[in-house]
Structures are given as C-alpha cells and as structure tokens.
Amino acid sequence: MHLIDTKPSRIEALGATFNQLQQGLTTIKWLCQLTQLLQHHRGATMAYLSGSQDFLLQIEQLQLSIESARYLITELNNNNYPCIPQDQLNNINNNWKTIAIGWQQDQVMHNFEFHSHLIDSCNKLLRLCMMEQLKPILLHSNSSHQALLEEVFVALPNSIENLAMLRGLSTNVAVIKACGKDSHAKISFLIKETEQQNKNLVQAVNTLSPDSYLVKTYQKPLHKFLLTVKMSILESPEVTADSSLLFTMSTDIIDTQWLAVSQGIQRIEDSAYRALIKA
C-alpha cells in the first residue's frame, strides 16, 4: 500500500501556491472592473464636456466606484503575494487623481487622451498579472491554454477598448452635432478595427469555447451600433445621431463583452485549480 505524500514541505508549498493564485485571480477581476469603470467615465465625461449635462450624475457615481476599486486593488497588493509592481500601481493611482481633480477644466480630446493612457496602463497590468500568476500553472499542465489566455486577456480587452473609444468619440460628435476631420478619421479607423477584431473573436470562440454564448449574443446589437454610427455620423451631410441612444447602445454591448471576459476568467480559474491539484 502506498501512502499519500503529506510531507509538510509539499503541503506548505501547495498552500502558498493556492494563496498566491487566489490573490492573483482576485486582483485580475478587480483590474477588469476598474478598467470598465474608467472606460465608462471617459465616455460620460466627454459627453458632459461637449455640453450634455445629463451625464453628471453618472460621472459622480462612477467616481465613487472607481475610488472603491482602486482602494481594493491597493489593499490586495499590500498582502503577502502582490502581483502588481508598486511603482506601476502608484502611477495608476496618481494618474487617476490627476484626472479626477482636473477633468472639468480639460478640453474634450485632452480628456480622451488622459483616460486612454490610464486605461492602456490597466490593460498592461492585466496582461502582466496573467503572465505572472496564471500562465506558469496552466501551461505546465496543458499548452492548449495559451490560446484561451490570449483570447481572454488580450483579444477581448483590446476589442472592448476600441469600442469604448468609439463610444466616447461618437457620443461627443452627436452632442455637438459636428464631426471634424480628425474625429471622422478616428471614428472610421475604430469601426474598421472593431469589425476585424470582432470577426477574429467569433472565429476564436467557435474554436475554443463553442459553449460561450455571450460573444454571440452581442453580434446583432454591435452591427446595428456600427451601422448607426456610419449612417448618422460618417455618411450623413449633417450629424443626426442621438447622443443618449449611441451611448446606451454601445454601453450595453461593452457590458456584455466584459461579462464574456468574466466568463473566460471563470473557465481559466477552474482550469488553474484543477492543475494545482494535479501538481
């Protein structure tokens, strides 16, 4: 009869790896939440700065939620297994404080760029946490997890960010009822990028996660939103788009996309715990 290895060193190592994995996954989930909130804040503040007072209550609520998310991420990172370099976390906190204090005095496109830089930093941290916390465990047990990690932590967030930027720019144009040359070029580019990224995502989902229904559920709303922007902004002699409608349409899609990220993270989490048990 073979006895199970219950040496303290093995059990302690397993416990330490479990705690590190759990903290890493929780940090990743809160980074996703923070990024989603910052994207929403960018779009709402752009609309407000363009002249739509209707977004002020949203902005105030978003800022409270962002503060809570930042606090929780910072507290997590102060525990035994930090996965975010302290200098990078400090940069995110400081950049947000700068935005929170001064956004009402910013020009619309400066506000757009400040937010976009901060969101890019959050997405880079998301990928860093994935590389540090998840990739070693998952790829050690099954190399096929690489494609799933790329889909959840690279492809989907990139696609979401392009659509979130398009939300901000198109809503801004709809509020002011004018589309300058630069805005026209940026919106056209983002539509093409979004269409191509979405095509790639659908193909990846059909291969990797045929049971992942969330990516499939927003296909018709996404096509409708992109067509609305094309027809009422890019191809119309006068901007006829309704700013509130564009913001709501795009936000519903973005929220569903972030739910798809959460669904992917849950699959990865389940696989990581199974791999840990087998280690």
Language model: regions and residue ranges:
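Hydrophobic alpha-helical segments
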Residues: M1-A279
